[in-house]
Amino acid sequence: MATKSAVLLGLLTVLCVVAQAHAAKSTVCTITVNSADEKQTFRRYLPEDKYQFVELVERGRPDWLASACRQHVKCDVLIISGHFNGTEFFSEHLDSNEFLPVAEMERASCSNSCPGLFSQLKEVYMFGCNTLNAEAGISASAEIARTLVRAGRSKADAERVSRALNARHSESNKDGMRRIFVNVPVVYGFSSVAPVGAVAAGTLSRYFHSASSAEVGSGRPSARLLSQFSTNGMTATSGMRASDPRAGYRQEVCQFVDDRLTPAQTLAFIHQILGRDMSEVRMFLDRIESFAASLTESERQAPTFVRALDELANDLPARERFLAFARDSDEPPLRARMIKLAHKLGWLSVEAEREELLRLAQDLLAGGRISSADVDLVCSLNRDHTLDADLRRIRPTPGVDDAVPADAILACLGNVDARPRVLQALTGANSEAVQIAQVYLQHRPIADVGELRSVAARVAQMTDPDAQVRALNTLAGLYVSDRESLDELMRLFPNARSVSVQRAIAGIFIRADYKAIDRDELVGVLRQHRLRSIDRDDIIDALLRRLQA
């Protein structure tokens, strides 16, 4: 009996030791959206009895992060491998659909729907460019200062207010990651260009040869690791704490993405923000827009949301402040965004929204110099031609020097008389006018064969090689399929005065409908009349290979 008890006690002891060993394992979570080199290197050097690896990315499943949350995965260490552009981690491989938006990281960090994923993190390793870059992002401080001055504030006071708002709201990548990985002791990343996967793997190998694997997951920054990656600008920080000066800002940001809040509750919070000074509302504009765009139809129809939206729509003082700020803005894209948002918030009917957009277009025409960005904006706003019916209310400003930009805006609004003048500018010598025409044609491409043939004929008669290249490059984007136009351009090739013009012609043919091309004739023209160049294997060679394939 004593022997059996001893055996049983020994067995229980072994089981307890095994259980404790298993429990003591640190969980290394990996998010691999590009290179697996870094993950594989960590796996190679970290002992299996102390570390277990969990890949969070499920290939072909877009909601893989939410899936990891539902499985109650708890990470001690997180390794993220992917290119980073400030808003998402992504892959360089065209056949890969996996990516990690910063917005989803914010949601996981702020929401109780994913309490475990980041809650016990001790270390984060981000292998992506600029993940911990400390330079602040795009600032609206100058724009806000100008608005405040126009509203009657002194220049000094306006600059003081805009600086304070910028300090609170303008984030660097480093600030954003500290806000996401709240309370995490160590967060590694790169202040500039990160090494590619294979190079990073080699550096990690050298680190593991010189350091104990126990450093990983210790929650303490490794001087050895930072030293190994010093030439690549690796740096380390810690996640935000409750005592951090920006903790209050994090609380407000989380209100936009916290899954525990209903859309009605989030809208009520937005209503509070819209009651603040408009210069601060401006700083929240991106997040308010993102929330409005994310709503499903069922969420919009929910009784609680309808009531919250009705309360906001009837807040006339907030409405007037918002629209006054929009109309006063000297940034047309911002004004357009605010008009669109005012409609979504119930402050503008469909008719009133159209009225505001028409007023914006009229102000651009009357405001003097019109840029290609202004043309792009108006064409985008009238993508569905909803403003065409009110074209008669738009009046071009007499004596405007920039006739082509004004014509482009009018043409975007459906003016049939302005369109030929814009197309005429495409073959002119004024590079700015050509750029305007190019932007216009991105929105209103040539579909009429007669128009295409007329433009192609004028391009063939141009004498300025640089201007001719600009016009030809525009035609290339139209994917020409008209035989007569292509024949005109084929006849131009032998008469071209520069290699650049010939290459631009080749650029049209390489994108053209090959059914409309006499391949043998074109190959003969290319071979016989090609100008000599020191460059090898250019677009003309690529065209020849394709024609002879």
Which stretches of residues belong to each language-model region?
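A short, glycine/acidic-enriched catalytic loop
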Residues: F84-F118, N130-L132, G137, R146-L148
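Bacterial N-terminal signal peptides
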Residues: A6-V17
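Alpha-helix capping and inter-helical loop/turn segments
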Residues: L261, S279, T296-R300, D310-A318, ...
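A domain-level signal for caspase-like cysteine endopeptidase catalytic cores
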Residues: A21-G86, D95-S96, P101
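Buried hydrophobic core positions in alpha-solenoid tandem helical repeats
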Residues: F322, L357-A361, A389-R395, R421-A425, ...
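Residue-level detector of extended alpha-helical repeat arrays and alpha-solenoid scaffolds
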Residues: R335, S371-D374, D402-A406, A433-Q435, ...
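Extracytoplasmic/secreted cell-surface and envelope-processing proteins
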Residues: E38-Q40, D63-W64, G86-E92, N133-I138, ...
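Active-site-proximal C-terminal subdomain of hydrolase catalytic domains
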Residues: F127-E289
